[in-house]
Amino acid sequence: MTKTTWLTYNDLAWTDSLITSPEECKEETEYFVRTIRDHSRIEVQTLLHLGCGAGMNDYTFKRHFKVTGVDMSAGMLEIARTLNPEVTYVCHDMRTVTLEQRFDAVAIPDSIGYMITERDLRNTITTAREHLKPGGVLLIVALVREDFQENNFVYTGSREEVEVTIFENNYVFDSHQTTYEATLVYLIRRKGELEIFTDRHTLGLFPLGTWFSLLADAGLEVKQITMEHAYDRFISHEGEYPLRVFTGVFRKTRFLGQTNQQC
């Protein structure tokens, strides 16, 4: 996992703002806000968003919290900083980032899938826990193995003379593996001229038992909710894409240092 692995988050990062918008993410993000507040044992004023991407969720998060976002894609952070100048953004790997500040809440709503080994997942959960104040809550949104379907998705968008269509195929090679493959095909037309790009992503797919075990091992009091229909509008055929929302309240304290880098 490196900063230059995927076109989606580097050379093609600009397509994200054509495919979706902060307004389209508002309803989903408001749901995350309510869930965070409902489960936290303390008043939530500060939020650490790990794997923040282009900042679409932050556009709504910042209306409720003082937000700090972390992502390892410089291309995505460039978009995020333009969209959300009020938000502090840090270029770093969410498995290892260490900030001087603790937060009332930590959210990972859209990027935990890139943890493809149990070790990576454990490290990310530990990093999140270490940035929580006692009584604060961690929110993670994940696709779990029990819910996986080999879906196909279609995303479209345009701006002026640029049209973008993205086809995504999800596939599991081995039912016993803890990963699946998401292959994306980009059709980009500029003034009618077509360019085609492909991008293959390996994503994590862990059973519920692993999630509960790792979250509990981190000292979190865990609850889980099923979130359905969030991606229904993008599925190209009959299918379902339920996601699990995990919340974990942290009661312990821990010293934090600082080792960061900026994009």
Predicted features and spans:
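Conserved class I S-adenosyl-L-methionine
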Residues: 1-43
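Class I SAM-dependent methyltransferase SAM/SAH-binding core
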Residues: 48, 55-96
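A short hydrophobic/small-residue beta-strand
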Residues: 67, 138-139
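A short acidic, Gly/Pro-enriched loop at the edge of an enzyme's catalytic core
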Residues: 96-106
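A short SAM/SAH-binding and catalytic strip from SAM-dependent methyltransferases
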Residues: 104-120
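A short glycine-rich, Lys/Arg-flanked "PGG" loop and its adjoining helix->strand segment in the class I
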Residues: 122-134
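SAM-dependent methyltransferase
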Residues: 139-212
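C-terminal lobe and adjacent flexible extensions of AdoMet/dcAdoMet transferase-like proteins
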Residues: 204-263
